[in-house]
């Protein structure tokens, strides 16, 4: 939590606004967490006090598992304004599946999570950040409107026909690096992180 608190302080000092979803090219920050770790529930009051309502990408198979959010906690947080979206069924690298396995991970998880939460799941974050053209097509066919990657860059850098969205992973960066990233200077790393996460 210390890192998160420092980052929030920096963002506020630099006059950034935390929003549930980006709708402007500058001045906004959207907070996301992958996997649905139990610690997010323990930190929920901090986020509420700071008017920050993160999007949390959860894998169906991890819900109610030790160390992860329970369905009851997820529903409580959703009622408070936290957003939950898809992160596959099993949280494995989606590029490793055959067509049937990929469909289960992407479509069945979307349907199951939508039913659990009483709302349509419209976004997915690729587990381990890994994706391919086949994964993108499957996600689009399943009805996902936004596909969140782990490729560095601004929110709009990859938005296009593939509906891919850049995200900057900041849990391990210094305060100076964090400011550099939020000042929209992370696009420099798009090609490098693309090589790490994208498979044709």
Predicted regions mapped to residue ranges:
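C-terminal active-site subregion of NodB/CE4 polysaccharide deacetylases
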Residues: 1-33, 37-40, 96-123, 129-200
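Acidic (Asp/Glu)-rich catalytic clusters
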Residues: 8-14, 43-52, 69-86, 140, ...
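Short histidine/acidic/glycine/proline-rich micro-motifs that form metal-
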Residues: 60-65, 93, 128-130, 153
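Histidine/lysine/aspartate-rich catalytic loop segments that bind and position anionic ligands
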Residues: 62, 69-104
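Thr-Gly-centered strand-to-loop micro-motif
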Residues: 88, 126-127
């Amino acid at each position: 939590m210390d890192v998160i608190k420092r980052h929030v302080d920096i963002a506020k000092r630099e006059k950034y606004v935390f929003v549930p979803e980006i709708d402007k090219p500058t001045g906004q920050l959207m907070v996301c967490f992958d996997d649905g770790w139990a610690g997010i529930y323990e930190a929920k009051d901090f986020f509420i006090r700071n008017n920050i309502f993160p999007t949390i990408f959860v894998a169906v198979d991890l819900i109610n598992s030790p160390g992860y959010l329970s369905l009851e906690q997820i529903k409580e947080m959703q009622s408070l304004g936290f957003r939950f979206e898809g992160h596959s069924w099993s949280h494995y690298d989606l590029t490793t599946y055959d067509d049937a396995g990929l469909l289960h991970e992407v479509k069945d998880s979307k349907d199951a999570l939508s039913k659990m939460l009483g709302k349509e799941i419209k976004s997915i974050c690729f587990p381990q950040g890994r994706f391919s053209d086949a994964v993108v097509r499957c996600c689009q066919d399943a009805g996902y409107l936004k596909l969140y990657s782990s490729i560095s860059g601004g929110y709009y850098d990859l938005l296009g026909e593939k509906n891919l969205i850049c995200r900057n992973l900041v849990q391990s960066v210094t305060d100076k690096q964090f400011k550099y990233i939020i000042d929209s200077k992370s696009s420099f790393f798009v090609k490098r992180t693309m090589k790490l996460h994208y498979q044709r």
